Amino acid sequence: MQPTAPPRRRLLPLLLPQLLLFGLMAEAEPATETPGSASVDTVFTARAGAPVFLPGPAARPDVRAVRGWSVLAGACSPPVPEPVCLDDRECFTDVALDAACLRTARVAPLAIAELAERPDSTGDKEFVLADPHVSAQLGRNATGVLIAAAAEEDGGVYFLYDRLIGDAGDEETQLALTLQVATAGAQGAARDEEREPATGPTPGPPPHRTTTRAPPRRHGARFRVLPYHSHVYTPGDSFLLSVRLQSEFFDEAPFSASIDWYFLRTAGDCALIRIYETCIFHPEAPACLHPADAQCSFASPYRSETVYSRLYEQCRPDPAGRWPHECEGAAYAAPVAHLRPANNSVDLVFDDAPAAASGLYVFVLQYNGHVEAWDYSLVVTSDRLVRAVTDHTRPEAAAADAPEPGPPLTSEPAGAPTGPAPWLVVLVGALGLAGLVGIAALAVRVCARRASQKRTYDILNPFGPVYTSLPTNEPLDVVVPVSDDEFSLDEDSFADDDSDDDGPASNPPADAYDLAGAPEPTSGFARAPANGTRSSRSGFKVWFRDPPEDDAAPARAPAAPDYTVVAARLKSILR
């Protein structure tokens, strides 16, 4: 347990007469308080079987407050305050429990009340657990715990939680009263020890002087957090959840740090919430990732919700402790309406907190990548008040065939992002599918329309040069020479094959007719000039065989030319 704030000093003059009066009536003797006490205020010793009343400070009549009584007890011997030293510089008195007693330790609520801002009890709401043996009182006239007949198991630490709300500024105090019940055997032994004469101490050897070396210079930093472990609120309240971070630096080296707030929404049927400390330092351990009691325990931070996180890189130490606010860092805050970080970038501020904000809030501070400080605060409403303890052991791993426990079935916090409704998902999917089908149909129609409008042929010039022969019924005895540009006299295939003369070629025969020349009005064909020069022509020539001799068969009458082939080719071109 962490040290808590003592009661207000202005109430001490009023408490002293009440403590003396009730101490005499209950035969309870306040024991000597350990110096430096911060969390344990008074220790009472009572006889077994005698009535005991543990008084608490009365409520202020002019403010609105929430108060509650709880007791820390267990199967082991009743806890008692003991001195606790964090190091050689800081020591205080707190309740210490053995590791074997942690599983049986319990913080049981006794009573809780909400007091209105008026002098009388009108408007007060009080809830007291029905226990005929122990009765807790939170009235305006009497505040305390009344035990009809004290027993040994009634020993323990009784806490009075008091929080002022409204215009009082959310002031919180926690008073701890320790009760020790002495049995009859212990009382007889104490009386026998008082009757024995005191003997002087036996002188021993002279003390040996030893020289102590100065401790080595420390490096790094040290952090401490002192939050309240429980915070009871009413839906709609606005309050500050503070961890009271304390920082101490031993050198000037820059450092990196991170601040994380984790939230665990507790199940409604959990009677005890365990925080496994080993899982905070080893979040990736299999037992921490899959604990057996996942719904009622805080194991690995990876299993919880991150409500606020801030990362600092290359931060300079600040002796005044303002480094979380002065250093630059990247921050993340959960998008919830009722939660935001405080101005110091460490604490949390709740604005109009709803009932769904109840749960366990765990604070973790890392220094250069290592966890240096952590603690928790149980923020709940009065109807969901449960117990929370820190467990220093490893959690039990869930069975391999056991189903993964899910989060508790509770409503989401107000303003938290929620998933879309199933009907909305179906509607959006249907609209999207219809849109895709429409786009595909439109694309097919456009492509078909373009294909129907596109010409599958190119317009060719039907009047260009065509290399063909005139239709005739006679055997094809026509020689088509090359074009004029490639024509040479020394390569004339129509020259005499038996001629061995290498001189210039003779002029073409007189019977060669140029079909491409300009026609004459008398004969329709132009004879080639004698000098062999020709005007620009298409390059097509047709050579006809000489008329046969007289002994040959008479020539047949010329048939009409067949232009079907030419017409078919022209049609194919014009298509």
From Swiss-Prot:
InterPro entries the record matches: Herpes_gE_N (IPR046463), Herpes_glycopE_Fc (IPR003404), Ig-like_dom_sf (IPR036179), Ig-like_fold (IPR013783)
An annotated GO cellular component: virion membrane
Transmembrane segments: 424-444
Disulfide bonds: C270-C296, C279-C288, C315-C327
Compositionally biased region (Acidic residues): 491-503
Motif Internalization motif mapped to chain: 467-470
Residues with attached carbohydrate: N141, N343
Signal peptide coordinates: 1-26
Keyword presence, Chaperone: no
Membrane topology note: Single-pass type I membrane protein; Single-pass membrane protein
Changes after translation: Phosphorylated on serines within the acidic cluster. Phosphorylation determines whether endocytosed viral gE traffics to the trans-Golgi network or recycles to the cell membrane.
Record keywords: Disulfide bond, Glycoprotein, Host cell junction, Host cell membrane, Host endosome, Host Golgi apparatus, Host membrane, Membrane, Signal, Transmembrane, Transmembrane helix, Viral envelope protein, Virion
Ranges where the record places region Disordered: 186-218, 394-416, 491-560
Spans annotated as Interaction with gI: 76-101
Membrane topology, Intravirion segments: 445-575
Protein family per UniProt: Belongs to the alphaherpesvirinae glycoprotein E family.
Assembly: Interacts with gI.
Chain's role: In epithelial cells, the heterodimer gE/gI is required for the cell-to-cell spread of the virus, by sorting nascent virions to cell junctions. Once the virus reaches the cell junctions, virus particles can spread to adjacent cells extremely rapidly through interactions with cellular receptors that accumulate at these junctions. Implicated in basolateral spread in polarized cells. In neuronal cells, gE/gI is essential for the anterograde spread of the infection throughout the host nervous system.
Name of this chain's protein: Envelope glycoprotein E
Lineage: Viruses, Duplodnaviria, Heunggongvirae, Peploviricota, Herviviricetes
